[in-house]
């Protein structure tokens, strides 16, 4: 904790901003502009709804800058069924790219597989007992950052809560982009290795993998610890 706070008194020359349903652009002085039925100054837009098949933009930021923290909470089921956290898909686009650098269901992005809630306590990902999902991976961008959310859920989702904490600041020339990929194999084969990641080229750091495993036969509920070979260059 002391290491984390050791430079808190230093001004880094950056502008901290936050995007929420209360301030969808993150602009200075634009938070809490909408009013609820309780009147001006009350929360009038604390969350957003999402129709089946709809895509909304959660964040649209002109750079350079760094996303430092993402917080989300969503329902885990609706009247139309469960698997809401698997049916909501996040996509991140850096610097006007056409193909997203991140494409992953919300639950799996926050280490909650199979659309089920789970408590996670780690440095980059933290999911609280009440369903608040946090990501602390820093994500730099030079020109532009865009994050979208698409619903593949069959029913209406009443609320999506989210916050993007970011900073407008210079980004070093050698800064790398954040990437995340979701992969699913419906049934593995005995004696055949499961490929976690393949076809990646360039320079970078592999920061880890979250895996959710399920046995289809009750007699095979024990999943032993496998070896994890890495093939580089």
Residue ranges and their predicted role:
Residues 1-84, 155-220:
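Solvent-exposed, flexible loop/coil segments flanking beta-strands in beta-rich domains
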Residues 68-69, 139-152, 207-209:
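Noncatalytic modules at the cell exterior or secretory-pathway interfaces
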Residues 83, 87-94, 224:
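Short, surface-exposed beta-strand/strand-loop-strand elements in extracellular ectodomains
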Residues 88-90, 145, 160:
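Short beta-strand/loop motifs in extracellular/secreted proteins, especially
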Residues 91-99, 167-169:
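Short edge-strand/loop segments of extracellular domains
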Residues 100-106:
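Terminal beta-strand-rich extracellular "head" domains
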Residues 113-144:
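Beta-sandwich interaction modules
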Residues 221-233:
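Single conserved hydrophobic/aromatic residue that forms the stacking wall/gate
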């Amino acid at each position: 904790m002391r290491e984390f706070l050791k430079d808190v008194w230093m001004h880094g020359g950056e502008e901290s901003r936050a995007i929420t349903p209360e301030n969808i652009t993150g602009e200075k002085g634009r938070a809490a502009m909408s009013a609820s039925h309780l009147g001006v100054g009350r929360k009038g837009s604390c969350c957003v709804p999402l129709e089946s098949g709809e895509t909304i933009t959660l964040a649209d930021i002109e750079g350079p800058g760094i996303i430092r923290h993402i917080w989300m909470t969503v329902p885990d089921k609706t009247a139309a069924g469960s698997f809401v956290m698997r049916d909501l898909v996040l996509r991140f686009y850096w610097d006007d790219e056409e193909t997203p650098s991140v494409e992953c269901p919300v639950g799996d992005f926050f280490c909650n597989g199979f659309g089920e809630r789970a408590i996670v306590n780690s440095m980059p990902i933290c999911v609280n007992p009440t369903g608040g999902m946090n990501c602390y991976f820093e994500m730099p961008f030079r020109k532009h950052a865009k994050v979208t959310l698409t619903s593949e859920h069959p029913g209406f989702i009443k609320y999506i809560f989210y916050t993007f904490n970011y900073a407008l600041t210079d980004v070093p020339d050698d800064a790398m982009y954040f990437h995340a990929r979701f992969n699913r194999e419906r049934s593995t084969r005995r004696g055949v290795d499961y490929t976690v990641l393949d076809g990646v080229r360039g320079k970078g750091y592999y920061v880890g993998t979250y895996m959710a495993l399920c046995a289809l036969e009750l007699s095979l509920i024990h999943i032993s610890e496998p070896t994890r070979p890495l093939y580089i260059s």
